[in-house]
């Protein structure tokens, strides 16, 4: 199959899980330390790690090191790296914005640009790269300066606060973006 087809994606996902499962079994003598690999994330079996006296972050670093050897992988981030929130720009910052300490995996795999891990039912919410996160933004109407072009890059997360500011509504709860300033100054 074509390297970016859904069939290839299914193969990649199985191969990635098998690669890491094998290495974890060899290192730790157990095959049950990883619950699942889904949506480019490894979810570790936290209760089992605790019972076995294994350090979650150390096992996550080991899993990341193994996953990083796959040819499709650009970078691998552990929860330990993501928890401090140290990424402010680029693809890593996009990963961080979508990551939750309570809900996300313990190891996040960033695939190389152009590659998505998804099955036959469709694609994902996108990669963390600019070609997948850039949305052309066109706006017109009362309160919008006429003929304004060439604004700075617009982030998806800036659209809701911009529209809220234009119509005089409070920003939505949990909103992380900012109104697009060019629209409010002539």
For each of these PLM feature ranges, what is it?
Residues 10-162:
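Active-site neighborhoods of enzymes that stabilize oxyanions during catalysis
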Residues 68-72, 164-172, 185:
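Sec-exported extracytoplasmic/periplasmic mature domains
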Residues 1, 27-30, 168:
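Glycine-centered secondary-structure boundary/capping sites
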Residues 179-186:
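C-terminal helix-and-tail extensions that cap enzymatic domains
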Residues 1-8, 12:
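Single conserved hydrophobic/aromatic residue that forms the stacking wall/gate
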Residues 156-158, 165-179:
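Extracellular ligand-binding/catalytic regions of CAZymes and related secreted enzymes
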Residues 2, 150-153, 171:
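Short N-terminal micro-motifs specific to bacterial/archaeal maturation
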């Amino acid at each position: 199959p074509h390297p970016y087809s859904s069939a290839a994606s299914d193969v990649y996902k199985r191969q990635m899980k098998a690669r890491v499962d094998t290495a974890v079994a060899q290192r730790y003598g157990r095959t049950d330390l990883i619950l699942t690999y889904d949506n480019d994330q490894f979810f570790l079996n936290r209760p089992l790690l605790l019972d076995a006296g294994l350090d979650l972050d150390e096992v996550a670093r080991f899993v990341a090191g193994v996953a990083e050897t796959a040819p499709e992988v650009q970078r691998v981030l552990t929860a330990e790296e993501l928890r401090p929130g140290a990424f402010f720009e680029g693809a890593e910052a996009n990963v961080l914005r979508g990551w939750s300490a309570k809900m996300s995996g313990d190891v996040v795999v960033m695939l190389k640009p152009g590659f998505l891990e998804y099955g036959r039912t469709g694609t994902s919410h996108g990669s963390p790269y600019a070609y997948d996160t850039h949305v052309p933004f066109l706006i017109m109407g009362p309160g919008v300066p006429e003929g304004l072009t060439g604004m700075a890059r617009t982030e998806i997360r800036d659209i809701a606060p911009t529209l809220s500011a234009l119509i005089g509504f409070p920003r939505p709860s949990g909103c992380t973006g900012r109104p697009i300033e060019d629209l409010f100054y002539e």
